[in-house]
Amino acid sequence: MPTINQLVRKPRQSKIKKSTSPALNKGLNSFKRELTDVNSPQKRGVCTRVGTMTPKKPNSALRKYARVRLSNGIEVTAYIPGIGHNLQEHSVVLIRGGRVKDLPGVRYHIVRGALDTAGVENRGQSRSKYGTKKPKK
C-alpha cells in the first residue's frame, strides 16, 4: 500500500481501454494516403472472399463469413448473421462491431438489409436485426 507522499510524487496510472473493433477507429486521408483516427459506428467495404468456417471446441456448425476490404483499406473478417445470404465476391457490404465468441478472429458483423446485403427471408421475430420488412397481411 503506497503512502500519500508516494502517490503525490507518482500518481496511479489509469487503465488504457483497448478497442474491441479497431478497424472502425481508423479513417483514410486520401490526399496523404494515410490512416487517421476517426471513430465510426459502421464502415462500408467490398467482399474479397465469402466462405464457411467451423467454430471452436464445444460447438459444431458451418458459420458463414466474409473477408471484407474496408473503405479505409483495412481487411477484416466479418460474420454473416441469419439463415441464407446473397453475398459473393465484390458485393458491397456495411459492417458493424461485435465479435462472434466461437469464431477466432471474427470481430465484426455484416449489417443485413444494407447496401448489397439482402434481409433474411420469411423472418417473423427480431426483424430489425436481420433487415426484414414487415410482412403483408
Curated annotation (Swiss-Prot):
Q: Known InterPro entries for this protein?
A: NA-bd_OB-fold, Ribosomal_uS12, Ribosomal_uS12_bac
* GO CC, alphabetical: ribosome; small ribosomal subunit
Segments for region (Disordered): 1-26
Instruction: List UniProt keywords, sorted A-Z.
Output: Ribonucleoprotein, Ribosomal protein, RNA-binding, rRNA-binding, tRNA-binding
> Bias regions of kind Basic residues — which residues?
9-18
Molecular function terms from GO: rRNA binding; structural constituent of ribosome; tRNA binding
Name the domain of life this protein comes from.
Bacteria
Would the keyword Transferase be found if you checked this record's keyword annotation?
Answer: no
| GO annotation, biological process | translation
Q: What does this protein do?
A: With S4 and S5 plays an important role in translational accuracy.
State how it assembles: Part of the 30S ribosomal subunit. Contacts proteins S8 and S17. May interact with IF1 in the 30S initiation complex.
> Which family is it part of?
Belongs to the universal ribosomal protein uS12 family.
Spell out the protein name for this chain: Small ribosomal subunit protein uS12
Question: What's the source species for this entry?
Answer: Listeria monocytogenes serovar 1/2a (strain ATCC BAA-679 / EGD-e)
